[in-house]
Amino acid sequence: METQNHLSCTGQTPLTNASGLKLLPQSVEPVYTNSTLTSFSQHGKVLNYDLPVNGLISPSLSNNAHGTLLSNEHITHNSASNNFDYLWKKPKSSVHKDSHVSNQFLVNGSTCPITNGPSIKRSPQETLGNCTSNQTASFNVSSHSVCSPNEANVKMVTAANGAHYGFYEASLPVSVSASNMQSVSGDNLVKERTVEENEAGATEERNHTPELAEALEPSDTQTDLNICEYKESVLDPVIQSTPNPLLPPDVSNLDDPSQLPSQLGDSHLLNEDSLEPFGADLIQDPISSTMYDLEELEVGSTKQKDPQLDTSSLDCPTYSLSAAFPLVAEDTNDSSVLFNASSASPVLGDSVMQESASEMGEDPEGSKAEEPVSGPENVSQDEMTIENTSPEPCVAAEHEEEELEPGEVKGTISRRRIATPEQVCFPLQHGWRREVRIKKGSHRWQGETWYYAPCGKRMKQFPEVIKYLSKNAGPFVRREHFSFSPRMPVGDFYEERNTAEGLQWVLLNSEEIPSRIIAITGKRGRPRNLEKAKAKEQKAKRGRGRPPKVKMIDLLSKADAKLLRKLENQDILSDSEKVQLCKLKKKMRRKARNQEAKLEAAKKLKEIKEKEEKKQKIQKAKNQEKAKNQEKKRTRRQPKQKAPVVQKPDRKLLAQQRRLEERKRQQFILEELKKPTEDMCLPDHQQLPDFPCVPGLFLPSCAFSDCLTTVEFLHSYGKVLGLDEAKDIPSLCTLQEGLFNVGDSLGEVQDLLVKLLQAAMINPGLPPYCQSLKILGEKVSEIVLSRENVSEPLRIFLEAYGGDIELCDSLRSHPFQAHAPHIKTAILAFIVNELNASSLIISEIDKTLENMSHYRKHKWIIEGKIRRLKFALSKRKSSEESQITTTEVSLRRRSERNAEENDELDSIDESAIQKDYVQEEVDIPPSTSVVELERQIEKLTKRQMFFRKKILGSSQRLRTVCLGQDRYRRCYWMLPHLGGIFIEGLPESAEPTEEAALGNDIEASSVKTEDKSFGSLCKTSGHPRNSTAEPEQNSTSCHCSDSKDKEPSGVTDQFPNSVPLTNNQQDLSQSVFLSWLTKNQTSIMDSTVLTPESSPPHSESTPIISSEATEKPEQWLPLISRTPCRNHNQGLSTHSSNRLSPPSPTAATSVKQVNEFTEEAQTFATSLPSNSTPCHVCYNSGKSSTASHEITLTSNILHDSEKEKRRGRRPSKLLKQIEQKYYNQLIERPIPAGVRQKWWWIKDPAMLESLLKALHPRGIREKTLHKHLTKHLQHLKEMCARPASDALFKFTPVDGHRVSQETLDRWSVTDLTFQVDLSALQWVEDLEQRVMLSDLQQRGWSPSAPDSVRTDLKYYEHQLEPADDITVKVKREDCRLYRESSNPLDLAVLRILCLEENVERKYLKEPLWLFSEVQHEKVVITNPEDPLSTTEIEYSITSRLRLWRQTVERCRSAAQLSLCLQQLERSIAWERSLNKVTCLYCRKGDNDELLLLCDSCDRGCHTYCHRPRMNEIPEGDWFCPTCISLQSESEFLRSSGSSKRIRKCTVRFTEDSPSKPSRRREHPTASQFSPGESPASKKRRMGTRSQSPDLTFCEIILMELESHEDAWPFLEPVNPRLVPGYRKIIKNPMDFSTMRHKLLNGNYSRCEEFAEDAELIFSNCQLFNEDESDVGKAGLILKKFYDARWEEFSQERNQISL
C-alpha cells in the first residue's frame, strides 16, 4: 500500500510466454479454491497467459513476440518516467474512446461488476479540476474499442486495510442498446444511492479478512486488468451484477496510496451538517460512466442470486468514490490530485469521505487486526526495478500531505472547503445581501445569518440556498460562495437592542463588529486539533456494533508502517527483506504487548486509587461521627450555667450622655449659623437701597453692556489706533441714537465701524487662509471702506474669525444699519475683542505693565522712607505706646499695599520688624527735630498717594474693575472714564447654578469664615479628649473654616470663648446656655423671625419641609465624615431623593412640621463631630438636593434628642426659633424678576454708605462685595462726585422720539433694507446725470426716467446660493439672474450695467480699462424673425471689466453694489470731460465752435491757434501734433470716412439739428450695438502709445504669471520680518508686483530687461528654497510655464521680423 509504484510497473515478465503458471515464492504456498483451475478462452492470436492468483487462473492476455503485453495503438509509453504523463500534461488522442462492456469474468466462483478503467477522456485541466466541477460525461463506444479483443482494461483497487482487491475488467465486444447509451440522470443517482445505503447497512456487521493482491499493469499497454479475490467464494459461471453500483473513475489518490479513503461503511460517522456543502452539487453532476445504466437493468435479478456473497469488498473507498485509482505527479511542482472527484458518488449522496491516514488504516467492518496473508502473484521485472529506483515520489507525497492549502483538510479525498471572506463577498457583488442578526441568548451572544436573494427572498439554511441556485442557476454565484457562519465579518450586522419603541434591530458600525464577533465566539482555548476532533466525532457518532480495535500496524512508526506494507505487498522477497519483515512483525507484537501491559497497569492503578478513596471517605465519616459523639458527651458532663444577669442601665450616665448630645447639637447649629452661606439662603437680609436706573437708557441690557465695553476700550486705546478722542469716539447718547438710526448719529456709528474695521483689517488682519480673497480684483484688506460698502467687508471679517453664521448670512442681503441695535452692538464688541489681540494693543499693554512696575518701585521706596521716619519719630517721643501704634500702623499699611497689588498676606515676625527698624534708624541724623520729621512724613505721604493713583489709573486702563456681586447676582462695575458705579442685572440666559459656581471660583480666594467654632476653641484646652466619644473631629477639612475676621453676628458676639470639653466637666452647662439665650433673646428674635422688613423683597416665604425628606439617611450620612466638603455636592446629589413641599403662605414655619424626623440617624447624632460638617460655601447651595440632605441631617439630630424622654428643664421656645432659623437658611430663594435685565448706577456717595450697611456679612457674594467697597471706598466716592459728562444721563424721553421702546418693538429689517436699496438706486441715477453733464457717454444715449420716484417699488429678497458670492471666481460668461422690476436694488443693477455699456471707451481708465489688456471680440447676432440674416459686431473688453460685469450681476445687497459703483466711478476719466477741455496753445476754453478735439487724447486746439492756421474744419479724424509724434503706425491715422468734431457745450445732439459734414459726424444710436460695444471706427489697436508691441506681449505674459495658481509666493515682495535671513542671502529681490510697477512706469525699454527680472525671480527662489518645499515646487512649475510662453513669444517675434 505504501509504495507508489504498484500501478506504474512496466517491462517484461521473467517467465516464458509458454508457461501457464507462474512460479510462486518458496515461502508462500499456493492457495487454490476447490482445487480447480479456471481457464479462459483465448481471443485472437494470443498465448495462454494464465495468472494463478490464490489458486485461480487469471485470464489470458494478449502478448507479442517478446513476451510483453500488447499496447494500444493510440497511446505508447516509452519509459517508466513517462508513465501516465498524458494524465497530467499531454492531451489524449482524439481517436481514443473508453470501452464499456456489460460482461464480467468469473473469478474464484464470484461475480464482479464491470467498472471503467482509468478515465482518459478528459483533458488534464478537466482531470485536475475541482470536485464540484460539472463535467458531463457521455457514454461513447468506438468501433475500435468494442471490436478489438486484444484490448483490455486492467484496474487495481486497494482496500483500506492494506490488502489489494483486484477486479478484472476487460474491454470486450458487447451490444449495448441505444436506451442505455446515455448519461445517468439525477433520479438514477438517487436510486442507486438508496440501494447502496441499504446494502452497506446489511453488510456492515459482517467480518472479512481480505488478503493481499497485486495488480499488474505493463507500461506499454492500455489494457487494464482488475483482479478481485473473495475468500471462500463459490465459482458461479453465470454472469450477474452486484447490487452495489460502481462509480465512475474520477478520483485519483496516487499522491499518497497509504491514505486511501475508508469504505462506505464508515460514512455514517459524518453528520449531515458536514455533508451539506457537497450534497446539491454532487447530486446534480452527471456521472461519466455507463455502468450505471447496465447495472440498473440487472439490479432486480441479482438481489436474490447469492445471499452469501460478500459485497463488503465492493464498498472499498475506490469504488465508493467516483474514481478508479489515484495518480500523482512525479514532480513536486504539480502535485495536485489528478482525479479530484469531479463527479459525486450516487451512493454517497451528501456524504463526505474520510481523510486521515489513521482512518484509512482501520478495518471498515471492524474485523480483528490479523496479519494479512500474501497470495501467490506474478510480479514483473520492471515493477521491481521501478520500486527500487524511484523512492522519491513517496517522500514528496508525504511532504505534500503535511503542507495543505488553506481551506483543505488533510487527506487525499476532497473535503468541504471553508469559504473565505473573499468568496463570501462574491454573491454580494451580484445582488445578494448577507445579514447577521445578533441577540443575547440565555448564556451568551448568539448570531444567525440570513441571505437575501436579488429578488428579495430570505434564506436561513443551506438547503434553501441550494434550492434557489438550482432553480436560478447563474454563471457566477455557486454554492461555495456561501457561508452561514456568523463569525465571518461579511455583510451587515444587526443587534437586538431595547429602545424607546421596544426591541429593535440596530445596524452596527464597522468598529462594533469585531467585538460582537468575539462575543459570539465566546471564550475559546487553543485551536482545535482536527485529527483529535475527528476522532472524537467518530467515537461519538459511531453506529451500532463492536468498536474497532486498534490495528497492530498503527503501533509502528510511519516509516516502519510504510516498509511493512511494502514488504507484505511484494510476492517475492529476498532473505534480507524476509528478516526485515520478521523484525517488523516482532516489533509490532512487542509494542502491542507493551501497550496492553500499560493499559493493564493503568487499569490496576486506577482501581487502587478508587479503593483508597473509598477507604478515606469511610474513615472521614467515622471520624466525624466520633467527634459528634465526643461533643455530645462533653455537653452532658458540663453543669448548667445560670443565665447572665441583665444589668440595669445607669440613669445618670444616660442622662449625662443625652446632655452631651444636646450640647453637641446646639454647638453644631451655632457653628453653622456663623459660616458664610449662599446669599439667597439667608433669611435675615436687610433691604438693599433702591438704586436709580440709568437715565435715558432704552437699549437692552446686553446691548448696553457692549456699548460700555466699546466706549471704555476706545477711551483706553483709541490713540493707539489713531482715533481722535474728541471726534471719533462717540458718547453713550450718540451711540444709542446711532444704533436707533437717528439722524447724524447713524453716520457717526457707521464711521466708527469703518475705522474699527479698517484697523482690524490691518492689524491683526485676516487669517492666512482669507488673505487671498478678492473683490473686483482687489484684496479685501485693500478696499477703501465707506459707509455704503462697509457691510460686505464686515461680513467677510466675521466669517474669517468665526462669527455667528446667521448674522453672516443676514449681512449678505441686509446692510449693517438695518439690523437691530443689540446685533449692531454685538458686532462692535466683536471687533473690539479682535483688536485686543492686535500687536499694537499688546505692545501698549506691555508698556502699561512696565509703567506700573516703575510706579510700584518708587512707591515702595517712599513707603520705606516713611516707615523709617515714623519709627524715628516714635522713638524720639520716647513713648512706648506710640512705638506700638507705629508698629501697628506700619503693619496695616503694608498689608493694604500688598492687597492693592493682589499679593497674599504674609505673616510678619515681630522680632524681624524690630531689627529692620533698628537698621533703618541709622540713616536718620540724630539732630533732626520732631517737627522736621513730621513735615518729611507729610511730604512723602503726598508722593505716595500720587504713585498710588498712577498705579490705580494704569490698572484701570488694563482692565475694568468688577467690585463683586450682591445677593441678586448683580455685578458692580467701576468705570473710570464714565464715572460712577454701574450695576448690571443678571442676564436672562444665566442659570443660577452656573452663576453660583462662577461666584465660588472667583471668590474662593477671598471668602473666609467667621470666628473659630467651638470645636476649635476646645483645642486650646490641655485636657485630653475621649476618643470614643468624639472620634476624629478634624477628619474633614474645609477651606472656609479658618477665618480670622470677626462678624457682628447677634448670635455669636457674646458667646463664651474658652470652655474645656471633657467627660467629667462639661464645656457649657445647660444653665449657662439658657442664661445666655435669655440675655440675647431680643436680638435673636429680631434676627430670626421672618418679617416683611427682614425678608428679601419679591422672595417667596419659607417652604415647609416634606416628611419624605429623611428617608434612608444612612445612605449619605457616612459621606460627610469621610468625603472632603468640596466633593459633597457630587457625593450627595447622587443619593438625593428628597424634595421640598410647596411654600407655605405663613411667615413662620411650624415647629412640629420641622421636627418630624426618623430614627435612623440616632447613632450618628452621638458621634457627629463638630468640625466634620461641611460648610455651605462648598455645597454649591443652588442645588436643592444638598439643602435637603442638610435638612435631613439636622432634623434627625433634633428628632433623636426629642425622641428620648428628657429630664430637667425643657428646651425653650427661643432655641427652637434658632433651629428654625438654621433650617430656613438651607433653602435658596429665587431671584426676583424685577432685578434682572436692567442697569443701575450709583452717583450719590451716601448711597454707598447705605449699601455697605445693608450687605449681609455671611453671604458669600455680599461679603466679597463689602470687602472691595470698603477697600476702594474713598476712590469710589470721588468717582461718584464727578459730574456726569455724558448726555445719556441727562436724556429725557419725549413722546414720538425715535429712541424709545416702541421703536425697538416695531423694528423691521426689511423696511430699513428697502430704504438702503432705494438710496443705492438714487446714487446710480446721480452717476448717470454726472456722466451726461460731463458728456462722457456714447453719442445718442441718454438715461431713462428716474425709477426712484416710482410708487410701486417694493423690497424683494433673492435666494442666496454659494456660487453667487462675489468673492468666488466664476468662469461662466453669462451670470445674469432674474431681476425684479419693482425692486430698487435690481433696478440699480440694470441701470448701472446700462451706464457702463454707454460710457465712451476712451474715457475709461484703470482699474477697469487697461490698454494692455484690451481684447477685441466679435459677436454674431441673429434676427429671430429672419434666421438667415446675421449681424457681426466687434467690440473691445478687458478682463477686469468682464469681472466687474459678473460681480454686478451677482450683487445681492446695496453694499456689494456700492463696491461696483465706486470702482466704476474711479474708472471714469472725469478730467477728460469736455467741460474742462482747453486749447493746447492759448490755454483758454472759449470759442467752443472753433475748438477741435483730438480723436486720440481728447485734447483741444482752436482752429486759429493751430499752426498752420486752419480756415475750415478738416474732414475725417483729427489728431493733435502730440499724438502724431508719438504714434508711428500709419494705420492708426487712417480716416474712417467721417469727421469727428465735438464742441465744448452742454447742448445735446439731436437728429433734427442742422448737420455740417465738416463739424460733426453722424453717430449711430446705442441700439445699433450690443451692450458694451462701440462703433468699429472706435476700435484701437492693442498696445499703448508709450509701449512697443513687444512690451505689450511682456505685459500679457506677466498677467498670465500673476493669474497662475502657483504664483502665490511671488506676487508681493518678501517681508524680511516674516522671513528672517532673506536679505542676507538674496541681494537683489524681485517679484511680480515690482515688475508690473516698472512695466507701467515705462522702466522697461526692451523685452530682454523684462526677461532678466523674471529669471531673477526664479533664481532667487531656487537659491533660497529647497526643491521639496512648497515654495520651491511652485517656483519650478511656474518657471516651466514661463519658459514655454517666452518660447512662443520669441517664435512669433521672429516670424514678424521675417
Swiss-Prot record:
<dbReference type="InterPro" id="IPR036427">
    <property type="entry name" value="Bromodomain-like_sf"/>
</dbReference>
<dbReference type="InterPro" id="IPR028940">
    <property type="entry name" value="PHD_BAZ2A"/>
</dbReference>
<dbReference type="InterPro" id="IPR001487">
    <property type="entry name" value="Bromodomain"/>
</dbReference>
<dbReference type="InterPro" id="IPR016177">
    <property type="entry name" value="DNA-bd_dom_sf"/>
</dbReference>
<dbReference type="InterPro" id="IPR028941">
    <property type="entry name" value="WHIM2_dom"/>
</dbReference>
<feature type="compositionally biased region" description="Low complexity">
    <location>
        <begin position="1091"/>
        <end position="1108"/>
    </location>
</feature>
<dbReference type="Pfam" id="PF15613">
    <property type="entry name" value="WSD"/>
</dbReference>
<feature type="compositionally biased region" description="Polar residues">
    <location>
        <begin position="1051"/>
        <end position="1063"/>
    </location>
</feature>
<feature type="region of interest" description="Disordered">
    <location>
        <begin position="1123"/>
        <end position="1149"/>
    </location>
</feature>
<feature type="compositionally biased region" description="Polar residues">
    <location>
        <begin position="1124"/>
        <end position="1149"/>
    </location>
</feature>
<keyword id="KW-0804">Transcription</keyword>
<dbReference type="GO" id="GO:0033553">
    <property type="term" value="C:rDNA heterochromatin"/>
</dbReference>
<feature type="compositionally biased region" description="Basic and acidic residues">
    <location>
        <begin position="890"/>
        <end position="900"/>
    </location>
</feature>
<feature type="region of interest" description="Disordered">
    <location>
        <begin position="884"/>
        <end position="905"/>
    </location>
</feature>
<feature type="compositionally biased region" description="Basic and acidic residues">
    <location>
        <begin position="610"/>
        <end position="632"/>
    </location>
</feature>
<keyword id="KW-0156">Chromatin regulator</keyword>
<dbReference type="InterPro" id="IPR001739">
    <property type="entry name" value="Methyl_CpG_DNA-bd"/>
</dbReference>
<dbReference type="InterPro" id="IPR018501">
    <property type="entry name" value="DDT_dom"/>
</dbReference>
<feature type="compositionally biased region" description="Polar residues">
    <location>
        <begin position="1023"/>
        <end position="1040"/>
    </location>
</feature>
<dbReference type="GO" id="GO:0005730">
    <property type="term" value="C:nucleolus"/>
</dbReference>
<dbReference type="InterPro" id="IPR037374">
    <property type="entry name" value="BAZ2A/B_Bromo"/>
</dbReference>
<keyword id="KW-0175">Coiled coil</keyword>
<keyword id="KW-0862">Zinc</keyword>
<comment type="function">
    <text>Essential component of the NoRC (nucleolar remodeling complex) complex, a complex that mediates silencing of a fraction of rDNA by recruiting histone-modifying enzymes and DNA methyltransferases, leading to heterochromatin formation and transcriptional silencing. In the complex, it plays a central role by being recruited to rDNA and by targeting chromatin modifying enzymes such as HDAC1, leading to repress RNA polymerase I transcription.</text>
</comment>
<comment type="subunit">
    <text>Component of the NoRC complex, at least composed of SMARCA5/SNF2H and BAZ2A/TIP5.</text>
</comment>
<dbReference type="InterPro" id="IPR001965">
    <property type="entry name" value="Znf_PHD"/>
</dbReference>
<feature type="region of interest" description="Disordered">
    <location>
        <begin position="1549"/>
        <end position="1587"/>
    </location>
</feature>
<feature type="domain" description="DDT">
    <location>
        <begin position="701"/>
        <end position="766"/>
    </location>
</feature>
<dbReference type="GO" id="GO:0008270">
    <property type="term" value="F:zinc ion binding"/>
</dbReference>
<dbReference type="InterPro" id="IPR019787">
    <property type="entry name" value="Znf_PHD-finger"/>
</dbReference>
<keyword id="KW-0677">Repeat</keyword>
<feature type="region of interest" description="Disordered">
    <location>
        <begin position="352"/>
        <end position="387"/>
    </location>
</feature>
<feature type="compositionally biased region" description="Polar residues">
    <location>
        <begin position="377"/>
        <end position="387"/>
    </location>
</feature>
<keyword id="KW-0863">Zinc-finger</keyword>
<feature type="region of interest" description="Disordered">
    <location>
        <begin position="240"/>
        <end position="262"/>
    </location>
</feature>
<dbReference type="Pfam" id="PF01429">
    <property type="entry name" value="MBD"/>
</dbReference>
<feature type="coiled-coil region">
    <location>
        <begin position="579"/>
        <end position="638"/>
    </location>
</feature>
<keyword id="KW-0678">Repressor</keyword>
<feature type="region of interest" description="Disordered">
    <location>
        <begin position="524"/>
        <end position="550"/>
    </location>
</feature>
<dbReference type="Pfam" id="PF02791">
    <property type="entry name" value="DDT"/>
</dbReference>
<feature type="domain" description="MBD">
    <location>
        <begin position="418"/>
        <end position="489"/>
    </location>
</feature>
<dbReference type="GO" id="GO:0005677">
    <property type="term" value="C:chromatin silencing complex"/>
</dbReference>
